[in-house]
Design a protein with these regions (language model features):
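Non-heme di-metal
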Residues: 2-248
């Protein structure tokens, strides 16, 4: 039985309309990310052994995020107690995913054991993306957390797994780890907006939240490209439009 509730697409549509002030920039920016070189790399992936380096970085991300979610839960102030089931369910749903990934990597001889993954040097871009979530957990701003992690990062994650899951099946290496994230991340993305206020896009608070969501998307894009040896740092304006893509 799935941990995640069946997606209510009518509710999703209502939230997209109600919060178009932030949904539109998120969608526009995340769509741009899908046009970047990393997705060409996935499309051209013909041997799962070529996924090893990316897989080891992904393991760190997959292993760390539930801990960040646990921190968000643990630091929840009394006045935010009603959010605890939401945070707890998200953390619990992600808790065993890194083990699933490790088992898959060992099964397909990408690594021989856990220590081999531990010995990998994590890219600064991967650390930056994870630390973005840690910073929000410490800050305990519910709206920033929901637009940044649940709506921005999770949407990009959903796009990633929608691309990589069928590719792995095509290569004869499909696995529940990849498949479950298509369901899980789609469940989390945008639905969290049910717990934030409605703002005008040009209001001070609206601009702060849009900027926080786009910051996460920028960090995500830099992170996944670092997994394949590309240094790129996209920058979006508050409409979600690309204004700069620095490649080093």
């Amino acid at each position: 039985m799935s941990l995640y509730e069946e997606i209510d697409y009518k509710k999703l549509e209502r939230l997209e309309v109600k919060h178009s002030w932030i949904v539109e920039p998120i969608y526009k920016a995340s769509t741009y990310v899908k046009s970047m070189p990393f997705y060409d790399w996935i499309e051209n992936l013909n041997d799962i052994q070529d996924f090893r380096d990316a897989g080891c970085q992904l393991y760190y991300h997959s292993d760390t995020f539930p801990k960040v979610m646990g921190l968000m839960l643990a630091l929840t102030p009394l006045e935010e107690t009603l959010m605890m089931p939401f945070y707890a369910k998200h953390a619990y749903g992600e808790a065993d995913h890194s083990k699933m990934l490790l088992d898959w990597m060992i099964k397909h001889n990408l690594v021989k054991d856990y220590q081999e993954v531990r010995d990998v040097i994590i890219t600064k871009e991967t650390n930056a993306c994870v630390n973005y979530a840690y910073q929000m957990a410490i800050e305990q701003d519910r709206e920033k957390w929901l637009v940044g992690l649940n709506s921005g990062i999770e949407r990009c994650s959903n796009d990633f797994f929608k691309a990589i899951a069928p590719k792995m099946h095509k290569l004869g290496a499909g696995d529940e780890y990849f498949d479950v994230h298509v369901e899980a991340d789609e469940h989390h993305s945008i639905i969290g907006l049910d717990y934030i206020e409605q703002y005008e896009a040009d209001s001070t608070r609206g601009k702060i939240l849009i900027a926080k969501a786009l910051e996460g998307i920028e960090l995500w894009a830099s992170m996944i490209h670092s997994w394949i040896g590309i240094s790129t740092y996209p920058k979006f304006n508050l409409k979600g439009e690309i204004i700069k893509d620095i490649k080093c």
